[in-house]
């Protein structure tokens, strides 16, 4: 009975596989939004103000960072919790595949969230005259929370690996 239970529990990790695959649909949706922004920008490129161009650029960088975060979570999560990715040893293979454990993934995700939050905060500051001061304060507090959390997670990971 115990062996059957353990095999069933071990096999249940495959429930995560379609979830990781589903994240690729979100990645596809981000790609659509990315190019939608560019297609809206191109016809108006000569009329758009410099500040607005910078804000659009920051939005595109934000989308790119979220996409990179998704790829990192999809591949590392699949490798750590479901099965090893067998993509061969071609020159296209990402050099970090198979080398990122759950702790490293957690730290990279935290760093990515801080980077995404930084871009978002920069967009808020560039548009500060249109945003209430209390909202700016909350954006800043949330960003500081992300930074401190990432630092604490990295520090805890460092002291537990010793």
UniProtKB/Swiss-Prot annotation:
Transmembrane in keyword set: yes
Keyword annotations from UniProtKB, A to Z: Cell membrane, Membrane, Transmembrane, Transmembrane helix
This protein's record includes keyword Cytoplasm: no
Any one cellular-component term (Gene Ontology): plasma membrane
Subcellular location: Cell membrane
Domain of life, source organism: Bacteria
PANTHER family linked to this entry: UPF0114 PROTEIN YQHA (PTHR38596:SF1)
Full protein name: UPF0114 protein Sden_0436
